[in-house]
C-alpha cells in the first residue's frame, strides 16, 4: 500500500504532508535498502504520522492503525525505527495522545492533567528556572506516570509495557517518576508500584520424565537397528534404603554358602544331646563305652562316666546333625528305675566276690577300700532314689521360653536380615515408622516436651515463695 492510497482512505488532502512523507520513505530506502522487515507494512503510515506531527496537523491515530491492518505495538515500533534512521529526536507524548492510544475516558485524561499541573506548582517552589536545571517536566515520562497513577486509582488495567515503549524509558526510571509525583502530591500516602512483567514459564527440569535412547549392540553397516527404550521418571523424594549397596551389587555373584559358614546358622546354637551311659562293672567296660562315643568338642574337662550317674551334655557340631526347630526333653521316672536296678545288680555282683566272712562294718570298710567305686555307687543310688521320689510328686513340665527371649530372637533375626539386605520395601518402611514413633515417645518423655513457665507465672511463684518463707 502506497502513501497516496493511505491518505485517500483517511480523506487527507494536503500536499505538504504528501511531499514530506514521500521524502521520508525515500530516505529510508536509501539508508536501509534491505527494508524494515516485519515493520515494512507500517512504513507509509509512520511516514504520514511523523509528517503530520511536524506540521502540527491533527490525525486520528486509531483510524490510521485500522487502515494499515496492524496493532498499536508494531505501529509504535515503526515510528521509533523511523526516528532513529532519520536521526531525529522524538517529540514527547502528551497526556491526550497517551489516553487516545489506550482509549481512556475524558475524566481520567482531565484528572491526570490536573495532577501534572499540581506537581509542577509544588516541586521546587514552582520556580521554572530552578526546575529546568534539575528536571524536565515537559518530558513524556511525567505525563505517562500521571496517567498510570490515575488509572490505578480508578482500578483500570493498562498494558504498562506498551506505555514504557511510548515513553522509551526503563522500568526503574518510570518507577522513580511515579514515586516523586506521589510523595509530592499525595504526601507519601498513596505510592503506586509498577507491576513487574511475569517471567517466562520455564518447565522445571526435575518434573520432566527423562527418556534415554539406547542403541542395540547388534548394529551393522548396511542395516542399522536401534532400540528405543524409555525410563520412568525418578521420584522427587528419595526413599532411604536400609540395604547396603555393596551387598546389592554382589547379589548375582554370591558363592554357595555352607550351613556352618553362614552367619545365620552360626548365630543359632546347636542342639544339646543328653547321653545317659550305663555303669559298667570294671574299668575296661567304661573305657570301651567312652571310646564308642564321639569326644566332646568343648574345651572344658569331662567327668568320668563310671563315677557319676548324672546325664552328661555333649556339644555336637552343626555339620553332623540337622537343626530341628525346637528340642524338648522330658525326665521320666522309668529311666531312674532302670538306673537303680543296674546299680543294685552291680553291687550284688561285687559283694559276691568277697570272702564269706561275717558281714560286719569292718568287712564293709574293707570292701570299700578294695573297690572305691562301690561307695560312689551307693551315693549315686541314694541320689537316684531321691530324684525318683521328686519326679513322682512333681510331674514333668515342658520347657517354655519367656516372652522376652522370643522378642530378642525376633530382633536378632530382623538385624541379620538388615545386615544381609533381605528385607522388602514394606518391611523397611515399617522399621522406619517404628523408629520415628520411638523417637517421638522419647522426646515426649524428655524435659524438652514439657511446657516452660511464662515470666508472669514465674513472678507469681516467686512472690508466693517469698511470702511463705
Swiss-Prot record:
Residues 454-469 have a biased composition (Polar residues). The keyword Nucleus applies. The keyword Transport does not apply. It comes from the Eukaryota. Disulfide bonds: none annotated. Residues 218-234, 275-308 have a biased composition (Low complexity). One of its GO terms (biological process) is DNA replication initiation. Its main location: nucleus. GO terms for cellular component: nuclear origin of replication recognition complex. Residues 218-241, 275-309, 356-423, 436-469 are annotated as: Disordered. Residues 380-390, 409-423 have a biased composition (Basic and acidic residues). GO terms for molecular function: DNA binding. Keywords: DNA replication, DNA-binding, Nucleus. InterPro entries: Cyclin-like_sf (IPR036915), ORC6_cyclin-like_2nd (IPR054113), ORC6_cyclin_first (IPR008721), ORC6_met/pln (IPR020529). It is found in: Nucleus. It holds the Pfam family ORC6_2nd. Signal peptide: none annotated. Belongs to the ORC6 family. PANTHER family: ORIGIN RECOGNITION COMPLEX SUBUNIT 6. Component of the origin recognition complex (ORC) that binds origins of replication. DNA-binding is ATP-dependent, however specific DNA sequences that define origins of replication have not been identified so far. ORC is required to assemble the pre-replication complex necessary to initiate DNA replication. ORC is composed of six subunits. This is Origin recognition complex subunit 6. It comes from Dictyostelium discoideum (Social amoeba).
Amino acid at each position: 500500500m502506497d502513501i497516496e492510497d493511505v491518505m485517500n482512505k483517511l480523506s487527507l488532502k494536503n500536499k505538504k504532508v504528501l511531499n514530506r512523507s514521500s521524502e521520508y520513505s525515500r530516505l529510508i530506502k536509501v539508508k536501509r535498502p534491505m527494508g524494515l522487515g516485519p515493520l515494512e507494512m507500517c512504513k507509509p503510515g509512520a511516514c504520514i504520522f511523523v509528517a503530520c506531527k511536524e506540521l502540527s496537523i491533527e490525525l486520528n491515530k486509531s483510524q490510521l492503525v485500522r487502515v494499515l491492518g496492524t496493532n498499536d505495538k508494531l505501529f509504535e515500533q515503526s515510528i521509533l525505527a523511523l526516528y532513529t534512521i532519520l536521526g531525529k529526536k522524538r517529540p514527547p507524548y502528551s497526556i491526550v495522545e497517551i489516553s487516545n492510544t489506550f482509549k481512556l475516558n475524558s475524566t481520567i485524561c482531565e484528572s491526570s492533567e490536573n495532577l501534572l499541573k499540581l506537581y509542577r506548582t509544588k516541586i521546587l517552589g514552582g520556580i521554572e528556572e530552578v526546575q529546568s536545571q534539575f528536571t524536565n517536566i515537559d518530558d513524556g515520562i511525567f505525563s505517562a506516570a500521571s496517567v498510570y497513577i490515575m488509572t490505578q486509582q480508578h482500578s483500570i488495567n493498562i498494558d504498562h509495557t506498551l506505555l514504557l515503549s511510548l515513553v522509551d524509558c526503563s522500568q526503574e526510571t518510570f518507577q522513580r517518576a511515579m514515586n516523586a509525583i506521589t510523595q509530592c502530591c499525595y504526601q507519601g500516602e498513596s505510592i503506586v508500584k509498577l507491576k513487574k512483567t511475569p517471567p517466562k514459564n520455564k518447565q522445571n527440569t526435575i518434573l520432566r520424565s527423562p527418556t534415554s535412547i539406547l542403541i542395540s549392540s547388534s548394529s551393522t553397516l548396511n542395516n542399522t537397528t536401534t532400540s528405543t527404550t524409555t525410563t520412568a521418571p525418578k521420584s522427587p523424594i528419595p526413599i532411604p534404603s536400609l540395604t547396603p549397596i555393596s551387598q546389592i551389587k554382589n547379589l548375582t555373584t554370591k558363592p554357595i554358602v555352607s550351613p556352618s559358614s553362614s552367619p545365620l546358622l552360626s548365630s543359632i546354637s546347636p542342639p544339646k544331646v543328653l547321653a545317659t551311659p550305663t555303669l559298667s562293672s570294671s574299668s575296661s567296660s567304661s573305657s570301651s563305652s567312652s571310646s564308642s562315643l564321639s569326644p566332646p568338642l568343648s574345651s572344658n574337662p569331662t567327668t568320668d562316666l563310671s563315677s557319676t550317674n548324672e546325664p552328661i551334655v555333649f556339644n555336637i557340631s552343626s555339620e553332623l546333625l540337622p537343626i530341628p526347630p525346637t528340642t524338648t526333653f522330658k525326665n521320666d521316672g522309668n529311666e531312674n528305675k532302670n538306673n537303680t536296678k543296674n546299680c543294685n545288680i552291680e553291687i550284688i555282683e561285687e559283694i559276691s566276690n568277697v570272702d564269706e566272712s561275717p558281714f560286719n562294718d569292718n568287712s564293709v570298710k574293707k570292701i570299700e577300700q578294695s573297690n572305691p567305686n562301690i561307695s560312689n555307687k551307693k551315693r549315686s543310688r541314694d541320689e537316684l532314689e531321691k530324684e525318683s521320689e521328686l519326679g513322682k510328686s512333681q510331674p514333668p513340665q515342658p520347657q517354655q521360653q519367656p516372652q522376652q527371649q522370643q522378642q530378642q530372637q525376633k530382633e536378632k533375626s530382623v538385624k541379620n536380615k538388615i545386615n544381609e539386605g533381605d528385607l522388602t520395601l514394606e518391611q523397611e518402611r515399617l522399621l522406619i515408622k517404628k523408629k520415628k514413633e520411638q523417637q517421638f515417645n522419647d522426646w515426649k518423655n524428655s524435659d524438652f516436651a514439657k511446657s516452660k513457665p511464662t515470666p508472669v507465672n514465674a513472678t507469681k511463684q516467686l512472690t508466693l515463695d517469698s511470702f511463705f518463707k
